[in-house]
From Swiss-Prot:
Record flagged with keyword DNA-binding: yes
Gene label: RR25
Top-level taxon of the source organism: Eukaryota
Keywords assigned: Activator, Cytokinin signaling pathway, DNA-binding, Nucleus, Phosphoprotein, Transcription, Transcription regulation, Two-component regulatory system
4-aspartylphosphate: residues bearing it: 68
An example Gene Ontology molecular-function term: DNA binding
Cross-referenced PROSITE patterns: HTH_MYB (PS51294), RESPONSE_REGULATORY (PS50110)
Comp. bias intervals (Polar residues): 333-347
Protein name: Two-component response regulator ORR25
Length: 694
């Protein structure tokens, strides 16, 4: 028996043992003939139950099974399934139905081949390949051999038992496989702030464009990190830097180191929360068109330690805001140093109405610009950069500061800041107000003049103040008395609106862009004939510039509603009783108002020019006006009268005065007319000299 099996194995495929199952006797006889012609050993049966019993009784006596698809006692696919589960033998299906769906169904159930009736000799000759393929697979799995037939059969039985056991324990096998797969998966790398900081340091040491994952991994020295992790993070980091460069217009390689690392860590936090890089608020605010808004972060100025409630001040090493006069041989101030403000309450008093928003309003709180004279610093270069950015061109002034300093103080070039007089800080109308006599006021075209150390502004901007009284129109916001400080500070709030933001249009001072010129040539364009007759000119050294057109502060602007009657009288009487013209006598001297000068405007109701150089509510003498201003002349014989109420028909028209008309004659004429005259369509009632009302 053993010798016969060994001989059959050496002559394979001769002697192949085949079990054929078909309920049709004709097909079964034809198949048997073909099998014998190919020198196979066939076993024929007509029912599936008999074939299944034979396989169970003698599982090692057959190498191959050929079964019909459609049988009476059992479906061929059912028999195929049972044989595959119990015996693990190769099964070939045959049928007269050659449809593709039927063939695919057979292959799906485990058939190794599908034959269409009538079966040809060529098909039968090639069936041995399935048996050979099956045996090679068993040999590979169990390291069996063909030394004799017994060993081959034993290997086949062992394989069948192993396969059956695995199928019975299919559920447990699936769970074990899932556990193995989860164990083999690579763990996800979490980028902590420390890892990201090491990554940023490595990238910027190598250069953003020259950094590669291999070199970055070598510099970071992290064992569990792979080049794929570094490459993914590097790609996201480059996209983040590109967005910053697009928003700010700056090269990422030129960012300050502290600012760069701070924003990178903030962006990492946003990345961990949202799954991608996102611009921080300090960078998001840089999309503003204001050039100073791009610096709107404490990290940009290396001032991360300041609290958000600190104020921004310009502080001098000797005296706060003690600016010298421009044009007296001052030298440029150097090295602004940032220091926190010690007492911000005094600074708020300088701006009782709460100045909000200007070209510097977007600078973050927490800075004091201290102008020191020693050496150079990064802050000085930063201020110079801010100056160049705001003007669109490099600064034409030497030094590391954007201002010219004189008299131990700091002031700015003529196209940015105005002159200073007597321990004050003064600025052009396009930047800051003008100060005189330790007060804080602005040029006449934007703000009104100051008297006796007070703070006064025109009716169209801010209320008027004199000698400790602060008067505001009813249609304006309430304000408080501005306490004059010996060391005035500049408080810059974070609000977005302010009257300062509207100052400084190009049509007012067309030559401001030329930094080689003083501001004086530009001012006469607004007042063409002031000072032409007696040589009076606008110079930085004159302290009485802001006092010109003193009476214009009491004129109502066209955009506001003036107050009349008892309401104005109740608020103007303290000013009339306290304002003295003697302060202006010594400073103003003689000056002429030219042909193009705007006419003097006077408010009605109880406003009178008193005697003894005082404005009071009492009735003065007729010669008080002439004695107060002996050199005051009105040169224009055709000076137009102006309505005080914005051009209405019932407005008060001032009388036209010729330069040759005597002032005393004018008063006598008014007396002769018994105090009543018609001027245009308005009506003037005289109760005293120059007291007119409706």
């Amino acid at each position: 028996m053993a010798a016969t099996q060994a001989t059959a194995a050496r002559k394979f495929p001769e002697g192949l043992r085949v079990l054929a199952v078909d309920d049709s006797p004709v097909c079964l006889m034809l198949l048997e003939a073909l099998l014998r012609r190919c020198k196979y050993q066939p076993t024929m049966t007509r029912d599936a139950a008999t074939a299944l019993r034979m396989l169970r009784e003698r599982p090692g006596d057959f190498d191959l099974v050929i079964s019909d698809v459609h049988m009476l006692d059992m479906d061929g696919f059912k028999l195929l399934e049972l044989i595959g589960l119990e015996m693990d033998l190769p099964v070939i299906m045959q049928s007269a139905n050659g449809e593709l769906e039927t063939m695919m169904k057979g292959v799906t159930h485990g058939a190794c081949d599908y034959l269409v009736k009538p079966v040809s000799l060529k098909d039968i000759q090639n069936i041995w390949q399935h048996v050979w393929r099956k045996r090679k697979l068993d040999i590979r799995n169990h390291n069996g051999g063909y030394n004799d037939g017994g060993e081959l059969v034993g290997a086949t039985r062992t394989k069948r038992k192993y396969t059956r056991k695995m199928r019975n324990d299919g559920d447990n096998y699936g769970e074990n496989k899932e556990n193995m797969d989860s164990t083999l998966k690579r763990q996800r790398v979490v980028w902590t702030p420390e890892l990201h900081r090491d990554f940023v340091i490595a990238v910027h040491e190598l250069g953003v464009d020259r950094a590669v994952p291999r070199k970055i991994l070598r510099m970071m020295k992290v064992d569990y990190m792979t080049r794929e992790n570094i490459a993914s993070h590097l790609q996201k980091y480059r996209l983040y830097l590109k967005r910053i460069s697009t928003q700010t217009g700056m090269d990422p390689d030129q960012f300050p180191e502290k600012w760069k690392y701070m924003n990178e860590l903030d962006a990492l936090k946003n990345y961990c929360e949202n799954g991608r890089y996102r611009l921080t608020p300090a960078i998001a605010s840089s999309s503003s068109s204001n050039p100073f808004a791009r610096m709107n972060s404490a990290s940009a100025l290396a001032t991360n330690g300041f609290l958000p409630t600190h104020s921004v001040q310009l502080k001098n090493s000797q005296r706060n805001m003690a600016m010298g006069t421009v044009g007296h041989g001052g030298s440029p101030g150097n090295n602004p140093v940032f220091q926190p403000l010690q007492n911000s309450s005094n600074a708020r008093k300088c701006f009782p109405s709460g100045p909000s928003g200007s070209s510097f309003a977007n600078i973050s709180n927490g800075l004091v610009l201290d102008t020191d004279d020693s050496g150079s610093s990064y802050a000085g270069m930063f201020c110079k950069s801010m100056w160049e950015t705001s003007n669109g061109s490099p600064s034409c002034h030497s030094g590391n500061s954007s201002a010219n300093k004189s008299n131990n103080g700091v002031s700015a070039p003529a196209n940015q800041f105005q002159v200073q007089s007597k321990f004050g800080f003064s600025a052009l109308a396009n930047q800051f107000p003008v100060q005189s006599n330790c007060g804080f006021s602005a040029p006449a075209n934007q703000y009104q003049v100051q008297s006796n150390g007070g703070f006064s502004v025109p009716a169209n901007q801010f209320p008027v103040q004199s000698n400790g009284e602060f008067l505001a129109p009813t249609n304006q916001f309430p304000v408080q008395y501005p306490e004059v400080n010996n060391q005035p500070l500049v408080q810059m709030n974070q609000s977005s609106t302010n009257h300062f933001s509207t100052i400084g249009n190009d049509y007012q001072f067309p030559d401001l862009a030329n930094c080689s010129k003083y501001w004086q040539p530009t001012a006469p364009s607004m007042f063409p004939d002031l000072g032409h007759n007696d040589g009076t000119s606008f110079r930085p050294s004159q302290a009485n510039i802001a006092n010109i057109n003193q009476l214009s502060s009491f004129a109502a602007s066209s955009g506001q509603e003036p107050m009349f009657g008892d309401e104005l009288h109740g608020q103007m009487s303290p000013i009339m009783s306290t304002i003295s013209l003697s302060d202006f006598d010594d400073q103003m001297g003689s000056f002429n108002i030219g042909n193009d000068t705007s006419p003097a405007e006077m408010m009605h109701d109880n406003f009178s020019l008193g005697s003894d150089s005082n404005i009071s509510s009492s009735t003065p003498t007729d010669s008080s006006f002439g004695s107060t201003f002996p050199d005051f002349h009105l040169d224009s014989p055709e000076m137009p009268a102006q309505m005080l109420n914005g051009g209405d028909e019932d407005g008060i028209l001032l009388p036209v005065l010729d330069d040759t008309v005597d002032q005393q004659d004018l008063f006598d004429q008014l007396d002769e007319n018994n105090g009543r005259e018609k001027l245009g369509s308005g009506r003037c009632v005289r109760k005293g000299p120059f007291e007119c009302f409706f």
